[in-house]
């Protein structure tokens, strides 16, 4: 429902934005050589962003994140290369944009009246609100008026102006600013180091997956639309191209697919499940991570690990009443097909599970988009290839696109309804379980990726601090 609302807002914003910009754009010839002379000459689009688990980060398979995927698609649309230019804050992004160091600022940036007067605004492509957070188990505040502890927000944040306006209604409201990032402040709330912080609803949802102690008190604001920002000087052609691109991204489902990939699974946050899972990541996964890495094949090893957690909670001796066993919960028939002799041996189980999933991937029709193929294959892994073929046929009969995971997955529960399954080749299936199976794996995979990203960030910070100490000692000795 929220995704539909966002897409409706998106379409309205695009229409209003286009109407508002008709006059200056009447003079723009919309051919690719006129999109942006500088970008075309250098054959590169430079996009400024902020390094965080929502917008952009470098994973084991390279660059990823919502803003990266959308920027990459726009660069492809312009037929140029892409360079992501990560900075530490929104202020730094706008400074770089004003100085011409970047072509676009893209970091889940809310609409702000003052900035829209200084920079050109791209179409809205998402929406989020500001939320007050506190540590789970502590007293939940009801309004900004009755905060009993310290509220800390990032320095140079758009929040400062919002809170100044709120202070007129709540004169007792006070807050402090910090040079820490929004993510770091959320972690401090989770660890009880500060009482409250305010973050976007998207940032809160993402970080709850790795710090489940983060709790939401209330929305500080209504939803704001999210935009890209462009330079106010000489960027009309780029702005025109961006409007065309966003229109096509809505029509061909790109925006919906990216939104589903990064946000849909976040709605399933469960405190107890997340705590148990994170504990397993810390204590159990290190033992088996080398095996997931060894047998990942063309997959991301985090995905393979997430599948195994969904199947067995990384218990090599797991056995179900139906006879499936081991880390990847293989049937006897699958084990025989993959030529393994002991399903309870972790290495054999992981190897066979990976090979079987690769086999299913090869059986997916070529018409399915590359980024969606794995989700179709996982549904088949869970309920069988025959039932997947059934739900694809059913989706087509209902007027949907059988190659679009967004459209197919919503029909999975129909496989358990008599009015539908009696007309299907392979009959009844617990499609609702396959739906939840895929959603859980996506959530688990993102949690593993974020956990290891944070571990790497801490290691990098530790090494940098040590290098600074060594450098200082060397300089003192030379004196």
From Swiss-Prot:
PROSITE patterns: TRANSGLYCOSYLASE (PS00922). GO terms for molecular function: peptidoglycan lytic transglycosylase activity. The keyword tRNA-binding does not apply. Its main location: membrane. It comes from the Bacteria. Pfam families: SBP_bac_3 (PF00497), SLT (PF01464). It catalyses: Exolytic cleavage of the (1->4)-beta-glycosidic linkage between N-acetylmuramic acid (MurNAc) and N-acetylglucosamine (GlcNAc) residues in peptidoglycan, from either the reducing or the non-reducing ends of the peptidoglycan chains, with concomitant formation of a 1,6-anhydrobond in the MurNAc residue. GO terms for biological process: cell wall macromolecule catabolic process; cell wall organization; peptidoglycan catabolic process. It is a peripheral membrane protein. Its EC number is 4.2.2.n1. The active site is at 311. CDD domains: MLTF-like (cd13403), PBP2_YfhD_N (cd01009). It is found in: Cell outer membrane. Residues 1-18 form the signal peptide. Keywords: Cell outer membrane, Cell wall biogenesis/degradation, Lyase, Membrane, Signal. Residues 267-479 are annotated as: LT domain. In the N-terminal section; belongs to the bacterial solute-binding protein 3 family. In the C-terminal section; belongs to the transglycosylase Slt family. PANTHER family: MEMBRANE-BOUND LYTIC MUREIN TRANSGLYCOSYLASE F. NCBIfam families: PRK10859.1. Murein-degrading enzyme that degrades murein glycan strands and insoluble, high-molecular weight murein sacculi, with the concomitant formation of a 1,6-anhydromuramoyl product. Lytic transglycosylases (LTs) play an integral role in the metabolism of the peptidoglycan (PG) sacculus. Their lytic action creates space within the PG sacculus to allow for its expansion as well as for the insertion of various structures such as secretion systems and flagella. This is Membrane-bound lytic murein transglycosylase F.
């Amino acid at each position: 429902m929220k995704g539909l609302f966002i897409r409706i807002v998106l379409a309205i914003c695009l229409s209003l934005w286009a109407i508002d910009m008709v006059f200056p754009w009447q003079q723009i010839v919309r051919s690719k050589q006129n999109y942006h002379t500088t970008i075309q000459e250098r054959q590169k689009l430079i996009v400024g962003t902020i390094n965080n688990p929502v917008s952009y980060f470098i994973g084991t398979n390279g660059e990823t994140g919502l803003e990266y995927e959308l920027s990459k698609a726009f660069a492809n649309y312009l037929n140029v290369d892409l360079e992501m230019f990560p900075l530490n804050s929104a202020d730094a992004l706008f400074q770089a944009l004003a100085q011409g160091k970047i072509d676009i600022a893209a970091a889940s940036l809310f609409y702000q009246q003052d900035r829209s007067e200084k920079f050109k605004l791209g179409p809205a492509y998402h929406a989020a609100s500001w939320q007050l957070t506190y540590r789970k188990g502590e007293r939940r505040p009801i309004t900004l008026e009755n905060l009993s502890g310290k509220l800390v927000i990032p320095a140079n944040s758009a929040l400062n102006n919002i809170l100044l306006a709120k202070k007129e209604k709540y004169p007792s409201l006070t807050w402090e600013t910090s040079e820490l990032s929004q993510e770091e402040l959320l972690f401090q709330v989770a660890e009880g180091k500060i009482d409250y912080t305010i973050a976007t609803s998207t940032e809160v949802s993402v970080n709850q997956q790795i710090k489940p102690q983060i709790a939401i008190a209330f929305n500080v604001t209504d939803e704001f639309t999210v935009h890209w920002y462009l330079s106010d000087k000489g960027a009309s052609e780029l702005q025109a191209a961006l409007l065309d691109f966003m229109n096509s991204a809505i029509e061909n489902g790109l925006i919906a697919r990216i939104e589903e990939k990064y946000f849909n699974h976040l709605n399933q946050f469960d405190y107890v499940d997340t705590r148990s899972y994170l504990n397993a990541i810390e204590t159990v996964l290190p033992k088996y991570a080398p095996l997931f890495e060894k047998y990942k094949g063309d997959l991301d090893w985090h995905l393979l690990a997430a599948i195994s957690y969904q199947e067995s909670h990384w218990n090599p001796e797991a056995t179900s009443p139906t006879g499936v066993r081991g880390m990847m919960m293989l049937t006897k028939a699958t084990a025989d097909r993959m030529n393994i002799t002991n399903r309870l041996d972790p290495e054999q189980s992981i190897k066979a599970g990976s090979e079987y999933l690769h086999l299913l991937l090869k059986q997916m029709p070529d018409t399915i988009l590359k980024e969606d193929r794995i989700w179709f294959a996982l549904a088949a892994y869970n309920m069988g290839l025959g039932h997947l073929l059934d739900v694809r046929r059913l989706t087509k009969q209902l007027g949907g696109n059988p190659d679009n995971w967004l459209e197919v997955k919503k029909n999975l529960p129909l496989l358990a309804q008599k009015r539908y399954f009696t007309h299907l080749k392979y009959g009844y299936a617990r499609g609702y379980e396959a739906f939840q199976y895929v959603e859980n794996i996506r959530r688990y995979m993102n949690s593993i990726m974020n956990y290891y990203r944070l571990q790497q960030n801490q290691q990098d910070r530790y090494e940098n601090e040590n290098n600074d100490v060594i450098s200082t000692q060397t300089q003192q000795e030379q004196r």
